[in-house]
């Protein structure tokens, strides 16, 4: 599985995650179910937002629909390849496939960071400036903000992919990870990676730290505003719409910070931590938003219990 130093690699072998061989089938079935339920859950969110006129024109739920698209996409570029680790035989990933996987993961992941920030800002405007909210956050503005998040995410993903794969890869081709990510791939480079590691740390650090700081600042203002609400029902509804977002942000940011914002150690915990944003978070997001968001729950009930009659269409 090693190439001589004068030969550039044309494929990589992803070693996957370590597991007992006797549990091969169990792990395959587990991640297969995770993948299917992720797609179905996020598709249900998309259909609910699109079908309910009370939701699909509101910026908060436009953002939620985009989040579902991102979750479905991240799961699709990571989990099927991970499942191949639990089948017999070695299945290399082509060099171009590795480039594409790294690009799309960082493109979608950074877009998700920006989107979480937009969702926090939207909640800040809705709760702290409710009278001006319809003017400050219009459907047109939310669409422009989403387009900006996609564009910034694409630039971030392209930067990371170009910096990583401009280096020569001519030695071992085993990526000690379950997908092509920057730290694992850089270990195979036949050149000094100091600049790459520094740029990666700064770039991802700026994205994560700036987005998280803006989210934190928004929620400090939101909590102060909620505590000033006089009615218990008003406070409950405000916490209901914000609680789901706080939960998914926490679940997403903690493992990302653990993986990228610490010195390179090649810890066996990296793989376990990376499973959270790549497989677990996309699976949990629909559950969190349907269980903790009262408006989504009510929209689901309306859609499931009250199908439209021909006269209503």
Curated annotation (Swiss-Prot):
> Which source organism?
Homo sapiens
Q: Does the keyword Ribosomal protein apply?
A: no
| GO cellular component terms, semicolon-separated | plasma membrane
What does the function comment of this entry state?
A: Odorant receptor.
Q: Does the keyword Transmembrane apply?
A: yes
- TM region positions: 26-46, 55-76, 101-121, 141-161, 199-218, 239-259, 271-291
Write the protein's name: Olfactory receptor 10G3
Biological classification of the source? Eukaryota, Metazoa, Chordata, Craniata, Vertebrata
Q: Which residues are glycosylated?
A: 5, 85
* Coiled-coil stretches: none
Q: Where are the Extracellular topological domains? A: 1-25, 77-100, 162-198, 260-270
Provide this UniProt record's keywords sorted from A to Z: Cell membrane, Disulfide bond, G-protein coupled receptor, Glycoprotein, Membrane, Olfaction, Receptor, Sensory transduction, Transducer, Transmembrane, Transmembrane helix
Q: Name one GO molecular function term.
A: olfactory receptor activity
Cystine residue pairs: 98-190
UniProt family annotation = Belongs to the G-protein coupled receptor 1 family.
Q: Its Gene Ontology biological processes?
A: detection of chemical stimulus involved in sensory perception of smell
Positions on the Cytoplasmic side per record topology: 47-54, 122-140, 219-238, 292-313
- What is the membrane topology listed in the Swiss-Prot or TrEMBL record? Multi-pass membrane protein
Q: Where in the cell is it found?
A: Cell membrane
